[in-house]
Amino acid sequence: MPLDFTAIDFETANNSAASACSVGLVKVRGGRVVDTAYWLIKPPLGYDAFLEWNVRIHGIMQVDVADALLWSEQLPDLIAFAENDHMVAHNAGFDMGVIAAASAASFVPSPSYDYLCSLQVARKTYHLDSYRLPVAAMAAGFEDFTHHNALADAQACAAIIVHAAGRHGASDIAELAELTGSRMGHLGMAVAEVLR
C-alpha cells in the first residue's frame, strides 16, 4: 500500500474536547500532499464559551465563528474529505477525542477511523530535547509555520509522518507504526460512552 493518509488538527474554544472551533485537514497520497481544507466551527451549544487562555493560543474568538456551521453540519464534510483514510495527528488522542466528544455533544454518531500519533512516531524517529509539534516538524524539515493554526499544524503533522516513513523505509502507515513500535488507535465509540 502507498503512504496514504489524512492529517488532522483541531483548535478548541475551551478545555472541553467538544468545543472544536477550527479544523485543518491535509490529504496525502503516495507521500505527497494532494489536498488541504480548513474551516471554522461553531462549537455545540453548552460547549461554546471561548476561554481567554484558548483565544490567546489560537486567536479565534466567538465573533469569528458566529456565521460558521455547527459541528453536526460540518461533520459530513470532514468525513467526505478523509474518506476511509488512516488519520494522523500530533498527540492524536486529543484530536480523536475532539471528534468523539463533539459528535456526542451534537448527538450525532462519531465516525470510525484508525489513527496514528505523529508524536509517538517522532519519539521513535528523532533524538530531540522536546517533541512538541514545532520542534518535531523542524526535525522533519518543515519550518516557519503558524503553530496553533489548525491547517498549519496538520501540514506539520503530515510532514513528520512523510519524513519518518522515509527514514524508516515504511511504505504505508501500518508499516510505519510497526517499525516505530507505535500503537495504531481506533476511533468509533458509541455516543453514550463519550458522555459518561
Locate each region found by the language model:
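Acidic, divalent-metal-coordinating active-site segment for phosphoryl/phosphodiester hydrolysis
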Residues: 149-164
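Ser/Thr-centric signal marking residues that sit
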Residues: 10-12, 118, 157
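Conserved beta-strand -> loop -> alpha-helix junction used to position metal-binding or nucleic-acid-contacting
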Residues: 109-122
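Acidic two-metal-ion nuclease catalytic site recognized across multiple nuclease folds
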Residues: 160-196
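Conserved non-catalytic scaffold segment of RNase H-like nuclease domains
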Residues: 1-101, 105-106, 110-112, 127-130, ...
